[in-house]
Regions:
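PEST-like low-complexity, intrinsically disordered acidic/proline/serine-rich tracts
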Residues: 24-301
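Bacterial N-terminal signal peptides
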Residues: 8-19
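Positively charged n-region of N-terminal signal peptides that target proteins for export
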Residues: 1-6
């Protein structure tokens, strides 16, 4: 069932691309790619058009809507405190591969080819512009993924292959990190599959994350970029760690007590608390019936 649903969604998302070029064609991904952002009447740039609040300011505590997380992930998210990002050893952490395509208000990317300087063989792609400098390499030369015991990094280990005019990338060896910036965790046992499809000057990337530790079903999300050749992706921001936590004892880790419940998001928007907690059932259209029943029950209180 999980495989059937995934294939159907990918086919729906990229079905129009099939008519752009023959099945054997390989689209050109090289260039500067900009995250689309809304432009205000005065010309100022506002937040991006896709999931703006989640990707810029970040989701509110307790907002797990649309995430097929299990109870273990939910408990870890409830215990998470944003102050953990103020620890000196964490202030320079980049966004992990599981999230970096969406993070930092939406990254602006440079995609370039990696060419062997001696043989001129095309080895892969380099993608730069991610928050914190966790730039990625996608190997296209057929090399295998390393042992499960090999080092896990922020960018993971990625290999790609062409499926018609769509690039499919498989990433493993990712650090334990997060899939959303309010504590929703991702484990080092996850696998990420990405599908890159170009529609003229638009590049759509569908991400599918399988995580046996924290997800009940694969998490699927898409992001869109616009080809912007006049853009120039700069160097990563340098971090200078400082004490932001005050007089805390050495080794203290910001956290909420196990069993805590983040209810502010549900209260603020008048959403039944149960509907904010994620889970695979909340990602399907049929959940609208459950939501209606929860709202009716909420109205009687």
């Amino acid at each position: 069932m999980r495989h059937t649903v995934r294939v159907a969604i990918i086919g729906l998302a990229f079905g129009l691309v099939a008519g752009v070029a023959p099945a054997s064609a390989q689209i050109d991904l090289v260039g500067e790619w900009l995250t689309p952002r809304a432009v205000q009447p005065d010309g100022a740039i506002a937040q991006q058009l896709e999931d703006g609040p989640h990707r810029a300011e970040g989701p509110e505590l307790g907002d797990y809507t649309g995430l097929p997380i299990n109870d273990f992930a939910r408990k870890k998210a409830e215990a998470w405190s944003a102050s953990v990002l103020s620890q000196p050893e964490r202030q320079g952490n980049p966004h992990p591969a599981q999230y970096s395509m969406r993070g930092g208000g939406g990254p602006n990317l440079r995609i370039s080819k990696i060419i062997d300087p001696v043989t001129t063989e095309w080895l892969g792609y380099r993608i730069e512009g991610f928050y914190g400098g966790a730039n990625r390499t996608i190997w296209m030369d057929g090399r295998p993924h390393p042992s499960a015991n090999a080092e896990h990094t922020w960018d993971g280990f990625s290999t790609g292959l062409w499926e018609g005019n769509m690039l499919t990338v498989t990433t493993t060896h990712m650090k334990m990190a997060f899939i959303q910036r309010n504590g929703v965790p991702s484990s080092p046992y996850g696998t990420m599959t990405e599908h890159f499809a170009r529609h003229g000057n638009y590049l759509t990337v569908m991400t599918v994350i399988d995580d046996p530790l924290f997800l009940e079903e694969p998490l699927m999300r898409t992001v869109t970029f616009v080809w912007t050749p006049q853009q120039n992706v700069g160097a990563p921001t340098l971090f200078d760690p400082s004490d932001e936590l005050g007089n805390r004892p050495l080794g203290w880790v910001p956290h909420n007590a196990q069993g805590s419940h983040q209810t502010e998001f549900a209260t603020r928007f008048g959403i039944p608390f149960e509907a904010t907690q994620g889970g695979k059932e909340t990602t399907y259209p049929e959940y609208m019936e459950t939501l209606a029943a929860l709202r009716a029950k909420q109205g009687k209180r």
